[in-house]
Each structure stands twice: as C-alpha cells, then as structure tokens.
A protein has these predicted regions:
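Gram-negative bacterial Sec-dependent N-terminal signal peptides
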Residues: 1-20
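Sequence/structural signature of beta-propeller domains
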Residues: 21-379
C-alpha cells in the first residue's frame, strides 16, 4: 500500500533546556523555538507532585480513574472526569481544589462530585459509557466517551449542564463507529481519549491511535496515524480532520512476550491552531513514559474526505509536532498521565496541571504534577 505523507512536517524534535534536577521546586524547562518559530516558545518551572492513593473514598465512592481535567476560572477549581464505567459508582466528574502557589503544589482535594446523566436524565447503566475527557465550553461542560469497540458502542462527545444532565451531542463523523469485522472504525480502548476547546469555540477531539482503516497501532519501529476531528463547538458539526503522527513505542517491555504501547492520551488548545498533546506509553516491567508535545495544525491537510489513510495515494501533511517535555528524562517517575489543563493558582500564577488515571489499581496512584508557565506561544 502507498502512503504519501510529507515526512519533514511529521515530527520536529527540539531538545529542551533544563536548569536543574526536576525534583527541585523551581527547576525550569524551556523549548525556545519549536518548528523554528520563536513566537511559539514555551517555558515551564516545576512546582511539585501530589498523590491521592488508590482506595481513597469520596461520598461512599472510590476516587480514581482521572482521565480529564479542566480549569474553571469562575470558581478557581478544576473539573476532573473519572473513567469509571458506572461500575464502582455512577459515571461522574469531580470539582477539585488544587492548592498551589509560586512556592509549590500543596494539595488536591474534592469539593464535590457530580453524576453524569444519559439522554433520559438517568445515571448511566454499567458499561454503557467510558468517560475519558472533559472541558468547559461556551454553553456547558463538554465531555467525551470512547465507547466500547468490543460491544460495538460508538464513542461520543456530549454537552452537559453543571448538574450533569444531558444538553446535546456532537455528530460522529463517518468512519469512526466500531464495526464487527474491524474493517473500519475505532479500536477498543483506543478511541475518543482527547478533547480540547480553542479560544474560537472550535472543539478538537482525538483518537488515541489509528482507526482500523488508517493503519496499525504503534510498534517499537513505527508510529500510528491518529485522527483529530475539528468541530464547530456551537453546532457540534465536524469541520475538518487532521492527522497526528503518534511516535513509535519508546521503550521495549522487560520480556519479549510482555506488553507495551504508545498513544495520544490528551490534548490541550493553546490557541486556534497550536495544541499540547500527551503521548503516554507503557512497557511492562518498565512503567510509563510520558512526553508532552506541541503540535501545529496550520498547514495540516484536512483528511475528512479520505476514507482510509492506509490506502490513500494523495499527498497528506500531518500536524507538525515538537517535544516540550519528557517527564522521565527530567527525573520524574510518572504514572498513567491522561489529564492536562492550564489554570491559575490563587496568587495569579499561570500553571499547567497534569493528572493520572490509576485504573483503580493498587499498584498505581492518582498523581498530579504542577508546573508554572513562564512563557507560552503568542498568537
């Protein structure tokens, strides 16, 4: 099969400047000119880590599975969605208080818990939903479910009211619904993992790895072509689709027959064409590798009319990407990072918060990292 992608645009890796050990509060990390564009530079300063252990209970329900995070400027709190599939408790999101200032991250605590409702106004039945992302939009709370490829349950993006009730649903583009023969559509557990809202109100939704018709999952030697759908946030109608080139798996498992993977686990809009993306990898016997990438969609091809990227002969320009941060490389030991938000500390400090999905596993933890944003791309 023939794939014509403009390789030079696929991945630009520029090393960050590191001022100190990442375990030191105040250590700084700078990517000055990603893509050769110094107006897109980003600088971060480490503010610390806070952990909530697996098994922590809130309102009689186990806390965990944090897969999305977004700052609410009106309250100064963060919304965090759990990927509990209405099994340990109802599908839900939390309002969190993140206590930090320029001196560091002090604590993360639950302010309240809100149950998400289906179209009939009822809590979701068990295994009928898989919440993975959450953002505040202009008319409510935007959240995504990645569906269930095995059960042929389609992914979706919906808008909820503050009380969790259903408001409306975005249109699912052709080619994303799961199929029994796996010829097209989402792969199980690799679907709508990512959600971002741009200043214009446009909404970006990404799949963790390639749709079946677009090619294979990442391997140790090759990457994967993830689609990002751009929606009109006001109407929920798709406007365009882009290709994000997920990197090859960066680390082999400890044993030849053990598992490993890599995928795009979250995106965050910096402006209307630049986003941050989390590439989250796991290798059995090694752990997680977490890299924060900046992507630029300015010259990316709209591939919404291309049914299969694997069988396409047209020239396609994917999103450009440049590495901003490698958490292991700066001395951190990240868990399963799936949540990312910009926000503000109580003293007005601009911050970037990362959060992990503990999979409700006793061998994992709910982990939050905080960074002060010293500089970010200018439009």
């Amino acid at each position: 099969m023939t794939k014509r992608f403009l390789a030079a645009a696929a991945f630009v890796l520029l090393s960050s400047t590191v001022s100190a050990s990442a375990t030191d509060i105040g250590a700084t990390f700078e990517t000055t000119c990603p893509f050769g564009d110094c107006a897109a530079g980003i600088s971060l300063s480490y503010l610390g880590e806070f952990v909530i252990p697996t098994g922590h209970m809130e309102n009689g329900v186990e806390f965990g599975g944090i897969s999305g995070l977004d700052f609410d400027a009106a309250t100064g709190h963060y919304l965090a969605i759990s990927d509990d599939r209405s099994e340990r408790g109802p599908a839900r999101f939390y309002e969190l208080n993140v206590d930090l200032d320029a001196s560091g991250l002090k604590s993360v605590s639950v302010v309240k818990q809100v149950t998400l409702k289906d179209k009939n106004g009822e809590p979701f039945a068990a295994r009928t939903v898989d919440p993975e992302s959450i953002r505040l939009g202009k008319d409510g709370i935007y959240w995504g479910s990645e569906g269930d490829g095995k059960a042929l349950l389609a992914p979706f993006v919906r808008v909820a009211a503050p009380d969790g009730s259903f408001v409306r649903e975005f249109k699912l583009p052709e080619g994303f619904a799961p199929t029994a023969d796996k010829s097209t559509g989402i792969r199980d557990n690799l679907a709508f993992e990512d959600l971002a809202v741009a200043p214009s109100g446009d909404v970006f939704v990404g799949v963790e790895a390639a749709l079946y018709q677009d090619g294979p999952n990442p391997s140790l030697t090759s990457g994967s072509l993830s689609r990002i759908v751009r929606y009109d946030g006001a109407t929920g109608e798709p406007k365009a689709e882009y290709v994000y080139p997920v990197s090859p798996i960066p680390q082999a498992a400890a044993k030849a027959d053990a598992g490993n993977d890599n995928g795009m686990s979250e995106i965050l809009a910096l402006d209307d064409h630049r986003l941050l993306a989390v590439e989250r990898s796991y290798a059995q016997g090694f752990g997680n590798s977490i890299k924060i990438m900046m992507m630029d969609l300015t010259d990316a091809t709209d591939v919404s009319a291309i049914a299969s990227l694997a069988k396409n002969d047209q020239r396609v320009v994917p999103a450009r990407k440049s590495q901003v941060l490698d958490l292991r490389a700066i001395g951190l030991v990240p868990d399963n990072i799936e949540a990312m938000s910009l926000g503000k500390a109580k003293d007005g400090t601009d911050v970037l918060i990362l959060g992990s999905d503990n999979n409700f596993s006793t061998s994992q933890k709910t982990q939050f990292y905080a960074f002060k944003v010293l500089n970010r791309p200018q439009q």
